[in-house]
């Protein structure tokens, strides 16, 4: 029986919830189902400015989106014998697992943390890299109520000589420099509750700005240094790369929702009508004082229940939106300056997310970011992605596509993820393997129930922990070669 694995990506945003169902088969990523809800369908009590306000409302909204995506993929069609896609479910694990986005509103970060490990036989193995990263995480001194989401290496030295990839190299002292993103454990527990109520199990958690950058940035941009800004409804999330590694991330509580709020307040019109005005007449390229068509817009007046209206010049509408958008770019720019990497953005500024769809936003950004290039980004095809990808080439879907690509190998090399697993790329044959420091397998497999560790995708997880703290972990003795061989033979038979 052919091996297939299903994974679901779920992006939980303030103004939008998206889900993608993807199939992994023979190293190919195929999207087979998608669904999303926008702000008109999501209960306002569910999520506010990236923060979950109600477990019940949030789980209901997420469950509805996931079920819609699964239905499109045929995953709810067990009894439908005429559905040609339902037959593939026989080879899937019965539990639905999801890669879930995590709002930067909940996160903090620690920069430039170092960890050291000594080699045993004068050769760097994955165990030494694991120990060095764990030592760095311990050195960060996080309290027990904190949970590390990402520990992202950006530099290695071996015997005080800088190296790009230390695996397999000869040396005695390995040092790693990492960027840590963490959150409160309570936030993780609440997210787990929501996803369980939504009918899925969390396989991994990825901060939304990181996922967006995976889906949109090129290798050249990451290497040169680039600021990726995911511009959403109520938040903007900034990620800065330098030398192909994440060096800075920041949550900013501004977004396109604030343009709507300004229009509602300054034009004395109800919020839903202000949103319609923004979508229909929004043009950020207009400058105050510039020539514009003599056009006016009739809009309802607040408090009149739609019985009264007034006329507003189009130029006034566009000026209000432009001023708020400029203020947003000023806030983003200040954060870039605070990062210390403003002079290292050879790849420029990349804008994605729903707000990036606004007419004239790239031109407006260029008037503010004058020292480097600006481009608008949609998800790009990577890792042999197939299926319904054409429908997702939209900046609104950068995060959810990035979640799937993270699973397919788009992560940072030697990253320690939210589950305490070291993920790395094998440059020789790009065959994914499960190398474990614990002799107990992290994922069980059988001839009829296999997992992604058998697929030819450029990613290999290393289980580094059983505890939830992800702090120092004592390495356990690995099985020998012949014992591993016997174990594999016994599983076959």
Swiss-Prot record:
Location of region: Disordered: 434-468
BP term (GO), one: FtsZ-dependent cytokinesis
Localization: Cell inner membrane
Domain of life the protein comes from: Bacteria
Keyword set, alphabetical order: Cell cycle, Cell division, Cell inner membrane, Cell membrane, Membrane
Lipid bilayer topology: Peripheral membrane protein
Keyword Cytoplasm: no
Gene3D superfamilies named in the record: 3.30.1490.110, 3.30.420.40
GO cellular component: a single term: cytoplasmic side of plasma membrane
Comp. bias (Polar residues): 436-465
Subunit field text: Self-interacts. Interacts with FtsZ.
HAMAP family named among the record's database cross-references: FtsA
PANTHER family named among the record's database cross-references: CELL DIVISION PROTEIN FTSA, CELL DIVISION PROTEIN FTSA-RELATED
Family from the record: Belongs to the FtsA/MreB family.
Function: Cell division protein that is involved in the assembly of the Z ring. May serve as a membrane anchor for the Z ring.
Name by which UniProt lists this protein: Cell division protein FtsA
